[in-house]
């Protein structure tokens, strides 16, 4: 199998703290670059866990179409600014950040007070602008998750009326692009490919860590396929016929035949169906007359048993 390597050939951090990493992967067999590129891109864009603001409480406000006295931005603008926060929480439970400020002030992300388990990536992100003589009180809920989670209108009915929910984007990777180039090989050798991937994150994780996490998820996905085992289907036992469930008493046998069968632990027609004529004769004190009596009783309900053990 062809061995390849991955090299990060470029890494940039933007003013908003988003990170861009460019990776060179190769050499690869023809077709493998497309397989790797598509698989990694799918996981990077939708399979990685991230953090996002999921709800905001604003003092004195109970719906998103309101305005706040002394605040330049309306509630929708503030919710959008909170939604766009690049944030990283290491707590699997909901974290709540709080903000209580007086104007005049331009409120930025760094002004929100979180526990030590929450990191605000872009602390200079503007949240709101407050005029002199006014104040603003915010409560911001942060959760971890995967992918995109729209606002659950049904859940809104059971939450506090002043807790404004936000559709949450948990995806830490903002963009993934890849290109495939053919590499030069010796004459007569099979063609080789080289994969170049550009990964852009929101800064809550690095492109290197994002690639590593995506690769680990793919390994976990494909690993079980390396140990495929055949599972034998267990045939379902057929349901016993109604006749087979008839108790021995209902065959109206003679007392002698009935008692002999009972002593042989025969309690129903189902038990008798495991016997042949020869087997019946081997029951203690069970003669041919009793055996013939049993055969006739079974035939009356449409059941026959073989003459000998080897009969088919």
UniProtKB/Swiss-Prot annotation:
Its EC number is 2.7.7.6. GO terms for molecular function: DNA binding; DNA-directed RNA polymerase activity; protein dimerization activity. Residues 246-312 are annotated as: Alpha C-terminal domain (alpha-CTD). Residues 1-229 are annotated as: Alpha N-terminal domain (alpha-NTD). GO terms for biological process: DNA-templated transcription. CDD domains: RNAP_alpha_NTD (cd06928). Belongs to the RNA polymerase alpha chain family. This is DNA-directed RNA polymerase subunit alpha. The gene is rpoA.
């Amino acid at each position: 199998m062809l061995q390849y390597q991955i090299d990060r050939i470029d890494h940039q951090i933007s003013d908003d703290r988003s990170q861009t990493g460019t990776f060179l992967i190769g050499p690869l067999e023809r077709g493998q670059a497309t397989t790797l590129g598509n698989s990694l891109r799918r996981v990077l864009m939708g399979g990685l866990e991230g953090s996002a603001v999921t709800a905001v409480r604003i003092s004195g406000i109970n719906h998103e179409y309101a305005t706040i006295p002394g605040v330049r931005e309306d509630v929708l603008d503030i919710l959008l600014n909170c939604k766009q926060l690049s944030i990283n929480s290491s707590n699997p439970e909901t974290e709540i950040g709080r903000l209580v400020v007086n104007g005049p002030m331009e409120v930025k992300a760094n002004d929100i007070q979180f526990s030590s388990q929450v990191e605000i990536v872009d602390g200079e992100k503007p949240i709101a602008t407050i005029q002199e003589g006014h104040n603003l009180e915010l409560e911001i809920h942060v959760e971890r998750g995967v992918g995109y989670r729209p606002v659950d209108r049904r859940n809104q009915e059971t939450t506090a009326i002043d807790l404004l929910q936000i559709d949450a984007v948990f995806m830490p990777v903002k963009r993934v692009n890849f290109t495939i180039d053919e590499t030069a090989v010796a004459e007569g050798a099979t063609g080789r490919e080289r994969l170049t991937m550009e990964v852009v994150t929101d800064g809550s994780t690095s492109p290197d860590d994002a690639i590593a996490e995506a690769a680990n998820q793919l390994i976990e996905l494909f690993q079980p396929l390396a140990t495929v085992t055949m599972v034998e289907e267990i045939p379902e036992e057929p349901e016993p016929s109604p006749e087979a469930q008839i108790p021995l008493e209902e065959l109206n046998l003679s007392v002698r035949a009935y008692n002999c069968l009972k002593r042989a632990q025969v309690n129903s027609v189902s038990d008798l169906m495991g016997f042949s004529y020869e087997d019946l004769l081997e029951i203690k004190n069970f003669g041919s007359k009793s055996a013939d009596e049993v055969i006739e009783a079974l035939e009356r309900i449409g059941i026959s048993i073989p003459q000998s053990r080897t009969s088919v």
